[in-house]
Amino acid sequence: MSYLFEILPSLLSGASMTLQVFALVLIFSIPLGVLIAFALQVHWKPLHHLINIYIWIMRGTPLLLQLIFIYYVLPSIGIRLDRLPAAIIAFVLNYAAYFAEIFRGGIDTIPKGQYEAAKVLKFSPFATVRYIILPQVTKIVLPSVFNEVMSLVKDTSLVYALGISDLILASRTAANRDASLVPMFLAGAIYLILIGI
């Protein structure tokens, strides 16, 4: 039992970094995903093609590969990022693509008559989206968004690949140092608690 109290501070420090990555990604990826979803409603083919290519790449390649690309490959063309910003950018770009598809699906379920009614009532396009479309879309997509949020909690463990001191790195360090699997089990329990919250 004393061993648990010995390793707990480093694991909680790692969990703090995990939560920081999670919060930053969530704060930036959901609004970006919503913007992308509404941009897909604009009837301009070049924009549609660019967004669809972006979504195809982000959803079709592993997040780990995207992390490695942003942190290790971009410096070869002169773009250097520290570990944490590189991880945040990779996660935001990846999750924004998923959120964009979720919100696009929600937007597509709204009947066209609602847009026409808003036009008759002289709502501006912004007011139509803000007061009529977005509240309904939010209600529709909430279960899917929560599923992605739970995936994000688990995916934050990938920042370990960049050497960021998250929960996984802290537990692995303790496990290697002490030749014990207890830190890994404790990390798993912390992830379960985070997902349960």
Predicted segments, located by residue:
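Transmembrane alpha-helices and adjacent helix-loop boundaries
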Residues: 1-197
